[in-house]
Amino acid sequence: MLKFIQNNREATALLAIVCLFVFPGALDSQYLSVQTLTMVFSSAQILMLLAIGATMVMLTRNIDVSVGSTTGMCAVLLGVMLNAGYSLPVACLATLILGIVAGFFNGVLVAWLKIPAIVATLGTLGLYRGIMLLWTGGKWIEGLPAGLKQLSAPVFLGISAIGWFTLVLALLMAWLLAKTAFGRNFYATGDNLQGARQLGVRTEMVRIMAFSLNGGMAALAGIVFTSQIGFIPNQTGTGLEMKAIAACVLGGISLLGGSGTVIGAILGAYFLTQIDSVLVLLRIPAWWNDFIAGLVLLGVLVFDGRLRCALQRNLRRQKYARFISPPTPLQAEAKTHAQQNKNKEVA
């Protein structure tokens, strides 16, 4: 059972989503609808993109806590360029490039300058957030072109063009990680850094690529965020980094690197967003969202740690079982007599 759960974290995440869908449905039958599924998916697109990027970084046994600030900074660039008269494709391309450059800078700090990832990205979290606020003077960006919001308008089956793009991108990244040498390098780097180097994997470049892709996903998340609400607050992206990491852990991405899938991270992001919708249904105040999300994350971390320890004990037991011969019938009988004599003495 333990091995099944460990090897099928995506299935357990999907089961959790189904349970969280059925439970509120018992309270309100209107919740059980395709419209609810598409509504939650629409709300989850930002977190899904960030979870895809976080997966790449976490697979290499690193972590990036600057993606929220990167998302905000990229959203500001998009808004500034659109208000300056640039076309939407040009503004989106520039936004994507900025995100990749920001991620590349994080990767250089970690892979080449050997700064621990948590320390480096904590620094860039403040740096990118500061650039964003200096850029806007602390003001909101409003008056964006109406064409931007069309990206989030439903086009097929209640899902927007940018929603379909997110699904296709998730499937593409899942295929790259599972079926190509490019993807296997991420797993190898996170699972055994020295071993990967001996096999010829350019581990520094793999880690820089992971952070760069993460920055690109943060830029896409900034575009989605802006298209959904039509303006850019000065706190855009705040707190998203923790939710992205939580989504990955919920979906089975190991904090120790080398294991997990993009599909699991996507399901984790959907589950976290689904919690928010259930809280709305239950009329629980919005300020409980972060508390409950944190509680769920802690619960999953504890469960993951206990599961890992149990599996390790089971593996050790199987490994050394062949060195421990079972007792002969004579030894078993002697042990039974000794136990009976001991019980008589005690009596």
From Swiss-Prot:
- Give the CDD domains listed for this entry: TM_PBP1_transp_AraH_like
| Record flagged with keyword Transmembrane | yes
InterPro entries, alphabetized: ABC_transp_permease (IPR001851)
Query: Any idea which UniProt keywords this protein has?
Result: Cell inner membrane, Cell membrane, Membrane, Transmembrane, Transmembrane helix, Transport
Q: How does it sit in the membrane?
A: Multi-pass membrane protein
Q: Where in the cell is it found?
A: Cell inner membrane
Gene Ontology molecular function terms on file: transmembrane transporter activity
Q: Where are the transmembrane segments?
A: 14-34, 39-59, 72-92, 93-113, 115-135, 155-175, 213-233, 249-269, 284-304
Q: What is its main location?
A: membrane
UniProt keyword Transmembrane, yes or no: yes
Pfam families xref list: BPD_transp_2 (PF02653)
Q: What cellular-component terms does GO give this entry?
A: plasma membrane
Superkingdom in the source lineage:
Bacteria
Q: Describe the function of this protein.
A: Part of the ABC transporter complex LsrABCD involved in autoinducer 2 (AI-2) import. Probably responsible for the translocation of the substrate across the membrane.
Instruction: Tell me how this protein assembles.
Output: The complex is composed of two ATP-binding proteins (LsrA), two transmembrane proteins (LsrC and LsrD) and a solute-binding protein (LsrB).
Family per record? Belongs to the binding-protein-dependent transport system permease family. AraH/RbsC subfamily.
Q: What protein name does the entry list?
A: Autoinducer 2 import system permease protein LsrC
Protein source organism: Salmonella choleraesuis (strain SC-B67)
Q: What is the lineage of its organism?
A: Bacteria, Pseudomonadati, Pseudomonadota, Gammaproteobacteria, Enterobacterales
Gene this protein is translated from: lsrC
